[in-house]
């Protein structure tokens, strides 16, 4: 009798590829690859009113900062322009969610030399993004251990000034 291990291994690997994270369908496609290839730094779009604490999905007015004159004939840009005119935001699908009981500062991480790719994967190579990294307490603590950052509970679970 042949051993079923090679066949089983093939099935497991194939299943892994079929369950690989697909990018969520966004209301307007956005290519990080295309925008970063033009030399635009992440902070051009990913800003926040409170510098650096929580960056997130840029408001449509940020997109329109360029797209009032760039690719205006694109149906996708026209969709963004409609949202801007209506003062509404597209119903973006958030990829990463940080629980409200966790204090997380992009600013602190970037100031210590962390790169966006460390958590978000090779953004510059992606047409669309998907959840590439398990954002969990264990993953954060492991990164803190590797980078000699504090793993004291209050470091992330109490707002710091």
Name every feature range the model reports, one short phrase each.
Residues 1-4:
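Positively charged n-region of N-terminal signal peptides that target proteins for export
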Residues 8-15:
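Bacterial N-terminal signal peptides
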Residues 17-22:
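Boundary at the C-terminal end of the N-terminal hydrophobic targeting segment
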Residues 24-78, 102-161:
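Sequence context surrounding c-type heme c attachment/ligation sites in exported
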Residues 76-87:
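Short, surface-exposed beta-strand/loop segments
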Residues 85-110:
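Alpha-helix-centered segments that form part of catalytic cores
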């Amino acid at each position: 009798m042949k051993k079923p291990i090679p066949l089983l291994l093939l099935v497991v690997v194939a299943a892994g590829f079929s369950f690989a994270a697909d990018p969520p369908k966004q209301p307007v496609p956005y290519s990080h690859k295309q925008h970063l290839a033009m030399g635009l730094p992440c902070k051009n779009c990913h800003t926040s009113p409170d510098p650096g604490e929580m960056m997130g999905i840029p408001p449509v007015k940020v997109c329109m900062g360029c797209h009032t004159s760039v690719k205006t004939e694109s149906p996708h840009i026209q969709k963004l322009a409609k949202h801007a005119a209506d003062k509404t935001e597209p119903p973006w699908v958030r990829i990463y969610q940080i629980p409200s009981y966790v204090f997380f500062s992009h600013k602190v991480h970037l100031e210590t030399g962390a790169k966006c790719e460390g958590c978000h994967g090779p953004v510059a190579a992606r047409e669309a993004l998907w959840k590439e990294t398990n954002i969990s307490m264990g993953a954060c603590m492991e990164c803190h251990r590797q980078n000699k950052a504090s793993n004291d509970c209050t470091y992330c679970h109490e707002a710091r000034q």
